[in-house]
Amino acid sequence: MKTLLLTLVVVVTIVCLDLGYTLKCNQHIPPFYKTCAAGKNLCYKIFMVAAPKVPVKRGCIDVCPKSSDLVKYVCCNTDRCN
């Protein structure tokens, strides 16, 4: 019985703990974040070049797009770095 209980505790711990395999990215308002889906291993934020201090959008992405004359993309790969 003790072995079964110990096994259950270990399984619940593994399921509940984030073991570092997922990335967390800020949403539009930075205190709020979401866990990225599998394959989305970058966080990003988009700025309008005319107003570089105000991010337009934030989230998870798989490949960082190239910036243009109007929009600047900033990508990173650590938790809540955007």
UniProtKB/Swiss-Prot annotation:
Record's superkingdom?
Eukaryota
CDD domains xref list: TFP_snake_toxin
The compartments listed are:
Secreted; Target cell membrane
- One GO CC term, this protein: other organism cell membrane
Q: Name one Pfam family in it.
A: Toxin_cobra-type
Under InterPro entries, the record lists: Cytotoxin_Cobra, Snake_3FTx, Snake_toxin-like_sf, Snake_toxin_con_site, Toxin_cobra-type
Keyword Disulfide bond part of the UniProt annotation: yes
Q: Which UniProt keywords apply?
A: Cardiotoxin, Cytolysis, Disulfide bond, Membrane, Secreted, Signal, Target cell membrane, Target membrane, Toxin
Q: In which tissues is it expressed?
A: Expressed by the venom gland.
Which N-terminal residues, if any, form the signal peptide?
Answer: 1-22
Q: Which PROSITE patterns match?
A: SNAKE_TOXIN
* Stored SUPFAM superfamilies: Snake toxin-like (SSF57302)
The transmembrane segments are none
Q: Provide the primary localization.
A: secreted
The molecular function terms in GO held by this entry are: toxin activity
An example Gene Ontology biological process: killing of cells of another organism
Disulfide bridge map = C25-C43, C36-C60, C64-C75, C76-C81
Function according to Swiss-Prot or TrEMBL? Shows cytolytic activity on many different cells by forming pore in lipid membranes. In vivo, increases heart rate or kills the animal by cardiac arrest. In addition, it binds to heparin with high affinity, interacts with Kv channel-interacting protein 1 (KCNIP1) in a calcium-independent manner, and binds to integrin alpha-V/beta-3 (ITGAV/ITGB3) with moderate affinity.
Give the similarity note: Belongs to the three-finger toxin family. Short-chain subfamily. Type IA cytotoxin sub-subfamily.
Other remarks in the entry: Is classified as a P-type cytotoxin, since a proline residue stands at position 52 (Pro-31 in standard classification).
Q: How does it assemble?
A: Monomer in solution; Homodimer and oligomer in the presence of negatively charged lipids forming a pore with a size ranging between 20 and 30 Angstroms.
The protein's name in its UniProt record: Cytotoxin 10
Identify the species of origin: Naja atra
